[in-house]
């Protein structure tokens, strides 16, 4: 989604949100990420300006004080940015890839089933369409945000094809877009 993303070319406009819209977004975030509730006011303080940065391909990035927090495509689900995920790693369930998959994931490739079932990888129970943080064997922080394309059970059984779709990864266009004022 952000492989060829460039802040100067892809951002079309930025709008400050009304309090009622912010409340609706907070409710949607609580519904989507129940574990975020104790930290939501810390992540999105009440008095700080919340803006939506509109980009090409119907991508919207939610910012607070210029810090990129969440993004979504069209009216779809919100995904946390990796910068937010590094501060609050418990927001998403984790899946771990083996060392051999790291370079492919960091170049934007989807996570294949063998990268999740081999020694060094850890596959935790998750349903289809669950948003997950992809961790790497021997590393502390997430290297990618993805969406389960198969359930964890099916990944173990089939062990072929795409297991997790790579949505946002370290060093992609969104990662390089540090803040937006």
Curated annotation (Swiss-Prot):
Subunit structure: Interacts (via PUA domain) with DENR; the complex regulates translation reinitiation.
Residues recorded with modification Phosphoserine: 118
Organism in which the protein naturally occurs: Mus musculus (Mouse)
Recorded coiled-coil stretches: none
PANTHER family, sorted: MALIGNANT T-CELL-AMPLIFIED SEQUENCE 1, MCT-1 PROTEIN
Protein name per its UniProtKB record: Malignant T-cell-amplified sequence 1
Protein family per UniProt: Belongs to the MCTS1 family.
Keyword Membrane tagged: no
Entry-linked Gene3D superfamilies: 3.10.400.20
